[in-house]
């Protein structure tokens, strides 16, 4: 059984069709790439899966449970975490405090509800993740004082705090330098080797080809292709 299954997902904004009957499945431990031009529906699909938007039609199943239209809070607690194109941090809080505060019902700009993890276990997990990401030495720094690449790492770490079964990354490499891209790719691959499941939106085709085992292509709200990196490279769209 697929870990995440999307069936005929459709989203309309007034007369505009942002998604049209898109179906795909994600297997446990998979690293799936989602590509397509701007406006192809990639982020809209993420938003419908994670409860930020309600789909106009279609269904989303997670571990066999229909989660279509459930709130972002419920989806998050079921085990699906995500990052946004716009980094979601609390700038006047320390790096460690950012890790200990989970945003529920993210809208893309705001945390509409907050849940702070307390206790030694939560702190230990936060510190272990910061160590893994290479920013443990910044634990007491304000998030606003971090470089953009460091903020990307912190945002990624916050998504990992809930021990999610699926992590959806929206343009994780956007705006970062080549060294940080290699760093992020290495972290994603290591976590995937540990059993974490990823769905990644990414415009950097070199990254997608090296990172993902399977790629789905969207265009104008429709799924138009699927294959391995080699198959997609052989049949450019």
PLM region descriptions:
Residues 167-171:
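Catalytic Walker B motif of ABC-type/P-loop ATPase nucleotide-binding domains
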Residues 35-37:
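The feature captures the beta-strand-to-loop junction immediately N-terminal to the Walker
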Residues 100, 112-141, 186-189, 237:
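Conserved ABC ATPase "signature" region
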Residues 50:
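Helix-to-loop junction immediately C-terminal to a conserved catalytic motif
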Residues 58-65, 78:
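Conserved ABC transporter NBD signature motif
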